[in-house]
């Protein structure tokens, strides 16, 4: 169900039709099924897959100059924000069973990924539960796919307008 939700929100089926109409669908499928394109989790870690995914998101965003900010925020800026939020390392109680991170306008969810990384740098054993909501169906699909790739709970990624249909009331 999660994968179908992701594919539908990202317009995947429309893209398949476009590639077929353009005569490139066979080549794309051939490239992804080639011997050197083995993306088995035993060969590519979740972190590496996330980096590949982020690179694709960045390239996609750069192709839409006027809307790039709606899809992609530089990792440097995200890390700066995460560092500001985690400046007081003493506030991270190692006895707390789980830490939650919530992004009300998550875009592609890269802020959640970076925050998770920064918290793990402070406490390697921390259980981190990420939540997010996004109004744009395409970037929501990317965020939910990223959560699946990283092994998180995709149900914690919700589609909708946080201002008038908050799916995580009480999380802030």
Model region roles, listed by residue range:
Residues 68-171:
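Conserved S-adenosyl-L-methionine
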């Amino acid at each position: 169900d999660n994968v179908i939700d992701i594919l539908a929100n990202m317009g995947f089926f429309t893209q398949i039709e476009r590639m077929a109409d353009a005569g490139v669908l066979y080549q794309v499928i051939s490239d992804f099924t080639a011997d050197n394109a083995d993306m088995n989790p035993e060969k590519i870690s979740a972190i590496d897959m996330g980096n590949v995914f982020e690179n694709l998101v960045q390239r996609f965003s750069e192709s839409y100059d006027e809307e790039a900010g709606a899809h992609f925020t530089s990792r440097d800026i995200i890390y700066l924000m995460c560092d500001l939020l985690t400046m007081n390392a003493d506030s991270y109680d190692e006895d707390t069973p789980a830490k939650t991170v919530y992004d009300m306008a998550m875009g592609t969810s890269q802020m959640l990924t970076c925050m998770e990384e920064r918290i793990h740098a402070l406490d390697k054993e921390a259980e981190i539960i990420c939540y997010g909501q996004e109004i744009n169906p395409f970037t929501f699909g990317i965020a939910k796919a990223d959560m699946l790739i990283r092994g998180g709970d995709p149900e914690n990624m919700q589609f909708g307008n946080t201002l008038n249909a908050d799916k995580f009331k009480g999380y802030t």
